[in-house]
Design a protein with these regions (language model features):
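SF2 helicase motor core recognition
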Residues: 209-217, 224-241, 254-265
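Short, glycine/charged-enriched secondary-structure capping and boundary segments
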Residues: 121-124, 166-168, 238-241, 258-260, ...
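Conserved C-terminal RecA-like helicase domain
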Residues: 1-223
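Conserved nucleotide-binding/hydrolysis micro-motifs of P-loop NTPases
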Residues: 113-115, 157-159, 230-232, 248-251, ...
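A conserved SF2-helicase RecA2
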Residues: 237-238, 250-256, 263-345, 357
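The feature captures the C-terminal accessory region of ATP-dependent helicases
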Residues: 330-395
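Short His-Asn-centered micro-motif
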Residues: 109-110, 226-228, 245-247
């Protein structure tokens, strides 16, 4: 590289490391590709530009005529829909079952019913990775969570646990008969579960969603798996006390609509506290291996939550105070500690309810706040270290 001009001090190691961040490098590469290579008269430069743009797309950046734009990256897709998330899903449901017992009402929400893997991630992701069907199979695949008798419902499909069929199928027929609906039910075995099919003009999502939701409220099934299109805004089930978000949406409206599903008063449990879960996959060996964690931070940028000190805070700090400052690499290194703490916290719903201070006076006006931490080791305040008056009775 070039030497620094005379009189310019050597930069610190942290400054050099910051200059190698993806944001800085993308800005430099974008200008070099668009203003240098693409405007060159050399065919070799044009070929190099296309090669560079192709490689940047792998990192989730598309170079356009007007500048860089974010796009889906293969590694980001792998992180979002990794099968390792299903191990965490089973751990979460098992912990919640131990705490809530027969009162558990869990809902698992995904983006799609099935997601087909693209050619770029072929052989890495399953054909239906990240979809509702894959999550449903994961719940059935564990002896503990299989006892929840899960049901999957989307806009086109209804699946029922094989252990549940004998009990729930007659209830389906009874429900339709009591409402004089034109539905003739049938089922097809699909291994560990059955696909419910219906014929007649009333076999529509609006009716079978109402029917299955009613069974869920009663506890015939204690776990629903579905898509955010069906289990999002407009769907209501007051008894939900566990919500697992496997979606990739980060917009304010979608996030608040989804989390709002569990914010319903339950007449059977006046002291109800619902746990909303995010499952995050990290892989520090990849350049884009923290995409899922960064998406998690964007989600909580739109959400309020209670902190350990009872403050209602908007941002990822209400999930864990360490997330406010710690870099993704630090989260990855201490992942097991965070996981253990979250599972322990989930078991203590009484404390969570106390932290919210339900029924106590509060101000509904949001305020911005700056957290200042002293690092001088001389107590409060450290004013004498920044050129202000020293702490005394007079000052």
């Amino acid at each position: 590289g070039l030497n620094l001009p005379a009189g310019v001090p050597e930069p610190s190691a942290s400054l050099v490391a910051g200059g190698n961040s993806m944001d800085v490098l993308i800005t430099i590469l974008d200008r070099y590709i668009r203003n240098g290579l693409m405007r060159s008269e050399s065919g070799r430069d044009h070929a190099l530009a296309e090669d560079a743009k192709s490689k940047l797309r792998m990192l989730g950046v598309q170079i356009t005529g007007s500048g860089p734009r974010l796009c889906a990256s293969p590694i980001g897709r792998v992180m979002a829909y990794a099968s390792a998330k299903y191990d965490a899903l089973r751990d979460i449901l098992s912990a919640e079952m131990q705490t809530l017992g027969p009162d558990i009402r869990s809902v698992i929400v995904t983006d799609f019913e099935k997601t087909s893997a693209t050619a770029l991630v072929e052989g890495v992701l399953d054909d239906d990775a990240g979809g509702a069907v894959a999550a449903y199979r994961a719940v059935l695949g564990c002896e503990t969570t299989d006892r929840l008798d899960p049901v999957l419902m989307t806009g086109t499909t209804v699946l029922v646990d094989d252990d549940l069929l004998e009990r729930i199928f007659p209830r389906f027929e009874q429900w339709a008969s009591e409402r004089s609906l034109d539905i003739k039910f049938d089922y097809i075995e699909r291994g560990d579960y059955f696909e419910i099919r219906g014929k007649g003009k009333d076999w529509l999502p609006r009716y079978y969603t109402m029917m299955i939701t009613e069974m869920f409220q009663e506890g015939v099934t204690k776990c629903l798996v579905g898509t955010r299109g069906l289990l999002g805004e407009g769907w209501d089930a007051s008894r939900i006390n566990v919500l697992v978000d496997l979606t990739t949406v980060t917009t304010s409206m979608s996030i608040n609509q989804l989390r709002g599903r569990s914010f319903r008063l339950d007449k059977h449990w006046p002291e109800k506290v619902a746990n909303n879960w995010d499952i995050v996959c990290l892989a520090d060996e990849f350049t884009k291996g923290f995409d899922d964690y960064l998406r998690f931070k964007r989600k909580h940028k739109q959400l309020y939550g209670v902190c350990d000190d009872g403050a209602i805070e908007k941002g990822v700090g209400h999930v864990h105070a360490a997330f406010t400052e710690v870099e993704p690499e630090g989260v990855s290194e201490t992942m097991e500690i965070f996981n253990e703490e979250m599972l322990l916290r989930a078991r203590n719903r009484v404390r969570t309810r106390d932290l919210w201070g339900i029924g106590q006076p509060f101000s509904a006006v949001p305020r911005e706040a700056i957290e200042i931490k002293g690092v001088f080791g001389e107590g409060f305040p450290p004013a004498n270290r920044i050129g202000l008056a020293a702490w005394s009775d007079e000052s």
